[in-house]
Regions:
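Membrane-interface loop-to-helix entry segments
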Residues: 13-62, 67, 71-75, 217, ...
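Membrane-interface alpha-helices at helix entry/exit sites of multi-pass transporters
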Residues: 13-14, 120-136, 223-232
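Select transmembrane alpha-helical segments in multipass membrane proteins
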Residues: 18-21, 51, 83-103, 140-142, ...
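Extracellular/periplasmic helix-exit of transmembrane alpha-helices
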Residues: 55-73, 117-118, 132, 136-175
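Hydrophobic, membrane-embedded alpha-helices of multi-pass small-molecule transporters
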Residues: 1, 15-23, 27, 59-64, ...
Length: 292
């Protein structure tokens, strides 16, 4: 869907074709198993994140004088009396929590599937590593993106064009399209880089979630080559279906599914809290003794 916006296509057929290409690419990778998944993601994810961060830092650094005003605008607009009066704060918080959960999976219990595959002597050490993911993903990368867009708008670049979109030069932009326009203003031709980054983000995310899904599938239906292949074909089919669907439908479905994971996971975390505490204390004790 994001690729449709970035490439300028606006049809179900175009989305399905993009989804088909992605499905073929992801299919080649996931049929190779977890070793190939690890080898692909460990190279792709750091590379794309580094490129994106460098581009953001360049834009922010080139307009460093606007940083104070940008943060001031974020804080004042979030808590101004008008927003409080119309209940906008609650709406923003709800959307913020939804998008944060969507971007970093915090509380969904999905990341633990990948981290549990890591061979480590102490489970708590891997848990601490996992804590870095939401910070880097949401606090660092998302904040940088927001600053780039806000700095771009200080020149009066766009106006509000309805729910989820803004008007730039008479054209309605949504989602990644706004980011692409902001990047292109300061780094000409960067929309192609951003399109590449989105592809890499999307492919790596689909690869990771395919692994989460196959582990859940095995738990429910048992291990077997036929069962595994059925799941993988279903997963690839939904890549095409999702690419052809509308953005609103995808957000609604994703929010519902994430809530369906978060609710039982929170209950599980509550009952497993004593175990987590025990493992953490054991790990901290080892670290303390090592320092002594």
């Amino acid at each position: 869907i994001v690729l449709k916006d970035l490439l300028g296509y606006d049809s179900t057929f175009a989305g399905a074709m993009i989804g088909l290409i992605l499905a073929i690419l992801v299919g080649i990778i996931i049929i190779g198993g977890i070793k190939r998944i690890a080898s692909v993601t460990e190279k792709v994810v750091p590379f794309m994140a580094l490129l994106y961060i460098i581009a953001c830092l360049y834009i922010i650094g080139s307009n460093f004088s606007f940083i104070d005003d940008a943060f001031k605008l974020i804080i004042t607009e979030a808590f101004n009396p008008t927003a409080i009066g119309v209940g906008s704060i609650m709406s923003v918080l709800m959307i913020g929590f939804q998008r944060a959960a969507f971007s970093n999976e915090a509380g969904a219990g999905s990341a633990s599937i990948a981290h549990s595959a890591v061979k480590t002597k102490y489970a708590a050490s891997e848990g601490l590593v996992a804590l870095l993911e939401p910070f880097i993903d949401t606090v660092v990368i998302c904040t940088m993106t927001a600053l780039v867009i806000i700095i771009f708008n200080f020149s009066g670049a766009f106006m509000y064009g309805g729910e989820g979109g803004v008007m730039i030069d008479g054209v309605l932009y949504e989602g990644a399209g706004i980011t692409a326009k902001a990047f292109d203003q300061y780094i000409p031709g960067s929309e192609y880089f951003l399109t590449t980054a989105v592809v890499l983000f999307a492919v790596s995310t689909m690869i990771s979630w395919s692994y989460y899904g196959i582990q859940s599938w095995k738990y429910l239906f048992g291990k077997g080559k036929v069962a595994d292949m059925v799941y993988k074909l279903m997963f690839l089919a939904f890549i095409v279906i999702g690419s052809a669907a509308s953005m609103n439908s995808i957000w609604a479905f994703s929010d519902a599914m994430i809530f369906a994971m978060v609710f039982p996971n929170m209950i599980g975390l509550y009952f497993l809290f004593p175990v987590v505490k025990e493992q953490l204390n054991k790990y901290l004790k080892v670290i303390k003794e090592a320092k002594v």
